[in-house]
Amino acid sequence: MLGIGAFKQRMPRPGEALPGREQALPLHNTHLVNGHPLRGEFIGLAQVQFGLGCFWGAERKFWNVPGVYTTAVGYAGGQTPNATYSEVCSGQTGHTEAVLVVFDEQAVSFAQLLRTFWESHDPTQGMQQGNDVGTQYRSAIYCTTQAQYDAALASRDAYQQQLTAAGYGAITTEIRFPAPTFYYAEDDHQQYLAKHPNGYCGLGGTGVSCPIGLDA
């Protein structure tokens, strides 16, 4: 039998992933910071999922961006439906810790969100982010439109040039379209750093400026 450590640096193969559950985890559907719903149809608004390490600090990066309507943390990109935090931390779900960002495209451009994403973490670290090691900390952009996907790929290529010039390696960010199912995390994790202002935040960027979204 494989131990949990076996899944820290590799994704579970078919048959290795935990089964999960049919029912979604309970969710208090109100954003603690802005009062908007966490779950809904969000008609007239755009959505994207970002993974950039521990989702506590990642979510705060985006709820502070003007034009973002709401944010929520959850699990995405893996195989286990409605996984729990402990299951995701085992590495046996294939999920990354993700932030759902719902935004008004008339108030904030996707390019600006991409710039926040790239500059808020080190996208060259593979299955970890800083001291947080495991597949659930991998960098990811899960797009909901073809236009987002094309823009994400172009931004990756532009940022790679800047990172290479600064001595960094290859970007390992997973970029996908269409976006996989987003499974909302437990209530305790939603807007965690608003509930615990001095709580853990392991995010750290490279210090390399991303050359997109400056004039958007």
From Swiss-Prot:
EC number from the UniProt entry: 1.8.4.11
Keyword terms, alphabetized: Oxidoreductase
Active-site residue numbers: 54
Origin: domain of life: Bacteria
Pfam entry (one): PMSR
InterPro entries: Met_Sox_Rdtase_MsrA_dom, Met_Sox_Rdtase_MsrA_sf, MsrA_MetSO_reductase
Keyword Oxidoreductase: yes
PANTHER family, alphabetized: MITOCHONDRIAL PEPTIDE METHIONINE SULFOXIDE REDUCTASE (PTHR42799:SF2)
Function: Has an important function as a repair enzyme for proteins that have been inactivated by oxidation. Catalyzes the reversible oxidation-reduction of methionine sulfoxide in proteins to methionine.
NCBIfam families tied to this protein: msrA
Protein name: Peptide methionine sulfoxide reductase MsrA
Taxonomic source organism: Xanthomonas euvesicatoria pv. vesicatoria (strain 85-10) (Xanthomonas campestris pv. vesicatoria)
